[in-house]
Amino acid sequence: MTSALIWMASPPEVHSALLSSGPGPGPVLAAATGWSSLGREYAAVAEELGALLAAVQAGVWQGPSAESFAAACLPYLSWLTQASADCAAAAARLEAVTAAYAAALVAMPTLAELAANHATHGAMVATNFFGINTIPIAVNEADYVRMWLQAATTMATYQAVADSAVRSIPDSVPPPRILKSNAQSQHSSSNNSGGADPVDDFIAEILKIITGGRVIWDPEAGTVNGLPYDAYTNPGTLMWWIARSLELLQDFQEFAKLLFTNPVKAFQFLVDLILFDWPTHMLQLATWLAENPQLLVAALTPAISGLGAVSGLAGLTGLVPQPPVVPAPAPDAVVPTVLPLAGTATPTTAPASAPAAGAAPGPPAGTATATSASVPTSAGGFPPYLVGSGPGIDFDAGTPAGSRRAQPAADNVTAVAAAQVSARHQARRCRRAAAKERGNADEFVDMDSGPAIPPSGERDAWASNSGVGGLGFAGTASNETVAAPAGLTTLADDEFQCGPRMPMLPGAWDLGTWDRGD
């Protein structure tokens, strides 16, 4: 219907001129004659080959070899017969096109008829006085319309017949190769000389070399060792994996080729693979693994081990720094019983000891008190001596009576003596430890050659009872009979709570030299 409307759009003069001025039916008739001659040639060759096969099977060549030869030639014989029939059909279709052209040429209004119609119409219009030619003019115009419709219908009919004839001509197929069933290597070579992909040919040659000719791949025929890819159904064999790899390679090559030429067909091809081809091979693999579970365990063990390693590394991201270990507090070091200098710190009372010779008489044993464990170290200068029994009335007269602590009861004399002996032993241990450390300490040597100048206000002088003799400033005499101080000595206050306010010093010291200040 569409073609008829297209032909109707043009006047009949155009169709008549094109149809009658073209090359005519000559070329189409020549093509029909050529197809007919080719069909007769194919028929003759097929007849000759059939006679030869019959003679081979019936003559002296009869036997398995003759039967194998006949079986190898039968596909080619069938192709010859089919090609002869196809050529005859093509010739017949072209002859039908020639007949349609002849019919269209006969039915088409000629250019002379169309010119006569136009001439008649012009004359009647020119002589149409007072409308006397109105009816003849209308008849002439109706005849022109008839020729218009006839030309369009003729062209539409000719087009339909020609298209149908051309479409019905069978396509030519390439002839099959005459091969025996065990001649796959020659088959592969002939394929290489054909239109196979060069990459596929290279892979086929590599497979053949690596396997020593045991794997023959024909990319064009889609076979491995003469069998199609789908003939290999056992994943437990190496040939199944080779066939699947080669099949996937060709499938993706075909998909890429179609993607550039016909994208719709390419995606249809991919859908067919996903729905029908790949599930079949996956089912074969799943069935084989179900029948051999030990292989599945062996295949999954490395993967599971890898996942365990990854999870172990992931645990490193959650490491929290451990809080610093707080060292346990060391036990309180035993501080030797050394009394501070008067005025440097507030000392506590120490156990009473026997007064040195020549010193003032000490208080009764009941007035002595024990010292605290944490006694500040004494400053340099005079030996630490304090006199007096603590603040008197005039020192802290405003202190409430309730805030004063009651004096402890008198200790046993034996306990006081034991405490004094323990303090002496402890002092000796401290001195021995200090002496050892002096021999092994790492210190920088001070290379000052000048005499050390004591700080201002400090006097580094004392009396020594051992070693090379007395040390200290001039005028100091050593008295071997002076006993070593044993602690804080407190003198008793009088009835007005006014005790001595000066420390008790050794009687051998020359106070006059000290008072001179040099």
Swiss-Prot record:
Main location: secreted
Compartment(s): Secreted, Cell wall
Pfam (any one): PPE
GO cellular component, one term: extracellular region
Biased composition (Low complexity): 181-196
Record-linked InterPro entries: PPE-PPW_C, PPE_dom, PPE_sf
Keywords annotated in UniProt: Cell wall, Secreted, Virulence
UniProt region (Disordered), positions on chain: 177-197, 346-375
GO biological process terms held by the UniProt record: response to host immune response
Source organism, top-level taxon: Bacteria
SUPFAM superfamilies per UniProt: PE/PPE dimer-like
Signal peptide: none
Keyword Membrane: no
Cysteine pairs bridged by disulfides in the record: none
Presence of the UniProt keyword Metal-binding in the record: no
UniProt record similarity statement: Belongs to the mycobacterial PPE family.
PANTHER family in alphabetical order: GLUTAMINE-RICH PROTEIN 2
Protein role: May play an important role in the persistence of mycobacteria in host cells.
Protein name: PPE family protein PPE11
